[in-house]
Regions:
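N-terminal cap/lid segment of alpha/beta-hydrolase-fold proteins
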Residues: 37-85
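Cap/lid segment of the alpha/beta-hydrolase catalytic domain
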Residues: 101, 107-178, 230-242
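Catalytic histidine neighborhood in serine/cysteine hydrolases
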Residues: 296-312
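Surface beta-strand/loop "capping" patches
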Residues: 327-372, 384-394, 398, 451-456, ...
Length: 613
């Protein structure tokens, strides 16, 4: 095939000269005005092809372009159902940070009747790679995680687009988006693909790329980002006790925001968007997901937030993505509408009321959870369950608070019974789908104007488990060697440990084991103090009767210097674990806990007065 090098090198030189004369682009439109993802040949290489379980799979590379005079290449996995009689819908998957192209993701969507591409933008070794296999090669630039400063910078550098001037094209995100848009070109040129039915998805940094690609390329007909892609990252956010800012930019912050801020890509998205996340995600701040997607005009939008989780989902949220893609690319059943929600702040008794009305004309409603919080930090807040009650077609709940001087946040999750059970890798059979309402927020000034009163009171009972683990999130819940159960309840002023109190945990444990308890201070709250992890290990004698473990704050020792915890006042999380290793090296697998018998049955956790009371 004839080389595209002369044309692309000329294009790069033209961009360099024109930029030097005109200055850097000042908007998203200007940033992308000179890039045509279809213009140059892809020069596709098929490294390997095989057939498996009714699918045809290829390890491929396509040419991204010539950057600074050197070829840049993207490796990827591509697959499609064997023997398809008609053109297929297609999806492009963009992996997250520290990850690589996911062959499993390709197989999952091939199994659902798609052609699927998973690009290897990070350049890590491809799955099942053989010696000598070509991989992603960015040539003279490096937007991978070998060049981490380049994500929050538009300054020049030896591995950036320009070496002599500040420009948005120096940012890694520009180059990665360019490479992924070329992936759309790869897809639309495959003979088995319907080019008018292409969707995109990505998690974390891949969620960022999903929003960037959707905001720059109208070939995208549907998008499903997760835990990433929200704007306002360069803005300081008011928290209780200080300010938090997600990103600090090297270079002109205003120029970065105008050309690379997601809030300036959202208005350019012209396709339906389903956003998946955890309510406490560190990377995709919940409040700003809603702020950003509100800028998408005239398109169907849905939200699915997993309660209490950070950077992961419950199965009922995970299933929303393939079903969303199925509807818009394959004509599958429409998902229920976003639940209608409202609240009344001004009530006669001074207690706000939240009301949510699910889409009752679609799939059956199995349950509704109404949540509220008084913590402005989306990463660290505890979401209280307001225990909504059905009233006609709506569910409603009172939102009592301790202090109207704090802000108030509320939303609801509605669970619908699926028309048929769904399966996804590594998950149990999924029979329900979770959709979130809009997020409602009120400032202290708004609460004062509505005459909201302090009607709540502190509680010493943290949990009696009559509702199971509803206020917790569980990791490896069924694995006897690696189970971990966590709650943020202890950061809420209602359940914060009183001064001098002791932590009492009542449980039943069939065999003797060492229980590990974790107390985390200032998780994500650098504006309040340094994060610290405190560990307490106690051997519990096995038996059939309940027993109570009573702990002082000083029983928890700092994982770094073994200094004791002074008090409970700055706790953000409490963990119950078979084993926990705070300082485990990246990539090292944890050692099993050598747990004997069944996972403990926890019966009650409470604060008890100190011995003097």
């Amino acid at each position: 095939m004839k080389s595209a090098f002369p044309l692309l090198l000329f294009a790069w030189l033209w961009i360099s000269v024109s930029t030097a004369m005109a200055g850097p682009p000042q908007s998203v439109a200007e940033l992308w005005a000179d890039f045509d993802p279809r213009q140059e040949p892809l020069d596709v290489e098929v490294v390997r092809e095989w057939k498996e379980d009714g699918g045809v799979y290829r390890y491929v590379r396509y040419r991204i372009g010539e950057l600074k005079g050197k070829s840049a290449w993207m490796a990827a996995f591509y697959g499609f159902p064997e023997g398809a009689a008609a053109k297929l819908p297609a999806v492009m998957h963009m992996h997250g940070g520290g990850q690589r192209a996911f062959l499993e993701e390709v197989k999952t969507y091939v199994g659902r009747g798609y052609a699927a591409l998973s690009v290897n933008w990070g350049g890590r070794e491809m799955e099942n790679a053989q010696p000598g296999d070509p991989n992603t090669d960015w040539g003279a630039v490096d937007p991978t995680q070998q060049n981490v400063p380049g994500y929050n910078s538009i300054l020049p550098g030896p591995k950036q687009f320009f070496e002599d001037r500040e420009d948005p094209r120096n940012c890694n995100w520009y180059l990665l988006t360019l490479g992924c848009r070329r992936g759309l070109t790869f897809l639309e040129r495959q003979p088995e693909v319907d080019p008018d039915r292409i969707g995109i998805l990505g998690h974390s940094m891949g969620g960022n790329l999903t929003m960037y690609v959707a905001g720059t390329d109208d070939r995208v007909k549907v998008a499903a980002p997760s835990v990433g892609g929200q704007g306002y990252r360069t803005e300081p956010h008011d928290m209780l006790g200080g300010l938090a800012q997600q990103e600090r930019i090297q270079g002109d912050v205003g120029l970065f925001t105008r050309t690379l801020g997601f809030e300036n890509y959202a208005p350019r998205i012209h396709c339906p968007v389903m956003h998946l996340s955890g309510t406490n995600d560190f990377h995709g701040w919940m409040d700003d997901v809603y702020r950003t997607n509100a800028l998408i005009e005239g398109q169907p939008l849905r939200y699915a937030f997993s309660p209490h989780l950070n950077h992961r989902f419950i199965p009922e949220v995970a299933v929303t993505r393939p079903l969303w893609l199925d509807h818009y690319l394959k004509g599958g059943p429409a998902l229920p509408e976003t639940p209608r929600s409202e609240w009344e702040l001004k009530m006669e008794d001074g207690v706000p009321v939240f009301r949510v009305t699910p889409d009752l004309g679609s799939w059956p409603v199995s349950r509704v959870d109404i949540y509220y919080s008084v913590d402005p930090d989306p990463r660290a807040r505890f979401w209280r369950d307001a225990e909504g009650k059905k009233n006609g077609d709506a569910w409603e709940a009172k939102l009592p608070i301790l202090d109207p001087g704090a802000p108030l946040f509320a939303f609801a999750n509605v669970y619908h019974t699926l028309p048929k059970a769904e399966t996804l890798p590594h998950l149990p059979e999924i029979r329900e789908l979770c959709l979130s309402s809009m997020l409602h927020t009120a400032t202290p000034a708004e609460l004062a104007a509505a005459e909201v009163k302090a009607t709540d009171s502190p509680a010493t009972l943290i949990d009696d488990f009559t509702r199971g683990w509803h206020d917790w999130y569980r990791l490896n819940a069924e694995n006897k060697q690696f189970w971990q159960f966590w709650t943020r309840k202890v950061t809420d002023p209602k359940w914060r440990g009183p001064e001098g109190s002791r932590l009492a945990i009542t449980l039943t444990m069939s065999e003797t084991n060492t229980l590990t308890l974790i107390a985390i201070e200032n998780e994500w709250r650098s504006y309040r103090g340094k994060k610290a992890v405190y560990v307490c290990r106690r051997e519990i004698t096995g038996g059939s009767e309940p027993q109570t473990l009573v702990l002082e704050a000083s029983d928890f020792l700092n994982a770094e210097d073994e200094m004791p915890l002074k008090d409970w006042s700055q706790l953000d999380q409490l963990g119950l674990c078979a084993r926990y290793e705070e300082n485990r090296e990246r990539g090292q697998r944890p050692e099993p806990a050598n747990w004997k018998g069944e996972i403990p049955e926890f019966r009650q956790i409470e604060w008890r007065p100190d011995r003097g009371n």
